[in-house]
């Protein structure tokens, strides 16, 4: 055993040992020593995109997963921790465009490098289950399930208004539009009509909502999904009209349908607004150039609800009217830029008096405002909005004819009944959730397995011809989808008639790839999409990933699972029983502004920071020139802010165990972690102390006997054991709660206790260090493995990989003596030591004889002695 701790040597030794054992290869139905089946535990981190290098967020995520699975393995579980690559996507195309290489080559090179980085971290990954979503063996099942969904009517083709990213030249799902911009390119998103393929996720809306309740997920994530699914109870009804199209037929059969959750305000309708793409708007624009220009302007606006809420509300009258279904009055129809054709029927009723958006719109365009809800003691002002105008809890109807005096629910019921009696409306549940448009006009993705034939139309690729393989040697040139220009891919034969045909050149949204990869881990070599091994491992026991995936990935994966269930492929309803959303890794930011005012971000490693006496930063200078830089504050590590820490550089300098220890100790897993160089050095120092303790006491520990101290223990031995097992009890509790930061804190207390127990014997130290190594092993497996092996523990307990998890010796916690605070007349004057089983009389006698009592009571006999068991004695003199 080396005298000096060398992380590189220690980690190489441990990793070679695990590799020789093939230590992390997992099989189904593993058996315990007694022949019983081990309970399974499947813990998985969200698979990474192979961008080229790991970042500290990856390190934290995978270390959390690793700590969890290593500890559970020691507790007797059959644990699975797999890894794969979310390998399709636009970044590979962009990199290929910039570097003149095929996306496939770029992707596979990155995978190789990142896999090597993960292996250097000592992660307990079963690499025999590795999956790359760009592999034909994987994406063939994307294609296969798509065709099954097509058969069932879940997948379908239609032309609709979509989010179009003009830079990436592709369609985006609503979730991929952030603040009106493309989530990858940052370009302002436009509306566009385009034929594409959809998956009917709305068919599962109620189930997706209801099944959230029992999941062990953060409430924040559940709420985000609930809001996105967006269940609304209301009334759908029609405004009759006699507007005819060019064919002489009434548009939409003479009915303009709207949906509202406020049917109680129907008597306050003073206008209707339709989307720019609505047939009535299109018809009106034919004879109105100004309206046609306005409609074109609307089509270039955002299609996101969040943007609709904040953007300026614009409108233009069509000159057409519809009829109020209950009063018979004419209601003018406007085109509004805030109305989406993709939501509901593409039209809304306007009730300015009781809807804040309509109120602003009506005041802007001088439309009538008719109050029909009254709240006692309030006065209505048509020029200034007040919150009570939209109150449905306290108001009653007035100026509403037969409905006057009704409250919200009474009015909704009455209005719905009257509309139904006329055949013009009914109560209805609507959803914010929209079907998932999966067509992408990109190359590097799963080809949609369809063929276009002039004679037969759209024809599915026969199952025996799957996968439709993506050519991996294409290099994008920035002028559209390379697949559309590659005759090898494009030209084919129609499977129905045998005539020349062409393949579909759209590829699938890459979120398809991440919908089910975690199931493929269970049976990566399977000849079917999933098999019986998936039944063993799924549903997953613990999923780990960032909060940013709360809607996008997690909702789609849940939907995909339910489709697979309905097709008889799986037997469960939900894929992820528990979810941990780890906090982001933060770091300081620094910058200078160039002549144009643009910020040039500087990496923290290139900056010297000046601090005050309390350690707070007060200034910073660039190391290269000694000139000041601006301190930008603490933000998420990112390339854009140039404040990332290279994990490989950290591992090269300090070792993987130090990186793991710091990321676990610095913050609870679900909270943000703020980078701290001093904290990294502290983690390294702790590991050196641990190693040094093993070196100093190595001979005595190797010569110790047994697995614990039972007979012949000294007071020092008992004190050490009591302290260690007290800490172990808390550490076990913290492991159950996934509070790994306090687990690390517990191991530091254990090492402090061992170092401080100068009078403890070798057996007590041997037992104590054995406890410490096992508790610490999941966090820092390399150093603990080597110490465990070198100091002889493997002979007693076996390999640390599967050593039994330490149980608390309750007998060690029992104290023969306890210390009580001693008070005289309510003031603390010292303490007394009494037998742990001493009764009240014995405690009173000991207290009365104490020197402090004699001194402060001035020799007088006590008037009264108050004993608070286990805590204190108060002598009243």
UniProtKB/Swiss-Prot annotation:
ATP binds at residue 639. Its main location: cytoplasm. Its EC number is 6.1.1.4. One of its GO terms (biological process) is leucyl-tRNA aminoacylation. Belongs to the class-I aminoacyl-tRNA synthetase family. It is found in: Cytoplasm. One of its GO terms (molecular function) is leucine-tRNA ligase activity. It is an enzyme of class 6 (ligase). GO terms for cellular component: cytosol. Keywords: Aminoacyl-tRNA synthetase, ATP-binding, Cytoplasm, Ligase, Nucleotide-binding, Protein biosynthesis. The gene is leuS. It catalyses: tRNA(Leu) + L-leucine + ATP = L-leucyl-tRNA(Leu) + AMP + diphosphate. InterPro entries: aa-tRNA-synth_I_CS (IPR001412), aa-tRNA-synth_Ia (IPR002300), Leu-tRNA-ligase (IPR002302), Leu_tRNA-synth_edit (IPR025709), M/V/L/I-tRNA-synth_anticd-bd (IPR013155), Rossmann-like_a/b/a_fold (IPR014729), tRNAsynth_Ia_anticodon-bd (IPR009080), Val/Leu/Ile-tRNA-synth_edit (IPR009008). A motif ('HIGH' region) lies at residues 48-58. It comes from Ralstonia pickettii (strain 12J). Gene3D superfamilies: 2.20.28.290, 3.10.20.590, HUPs, Isoleucyl-tRNA Synthetase, Domain 1, Valyl/Leucyl/Isoleucyl-tRNA synthetase, editing domain. This is Leucine--tRNA ligase.
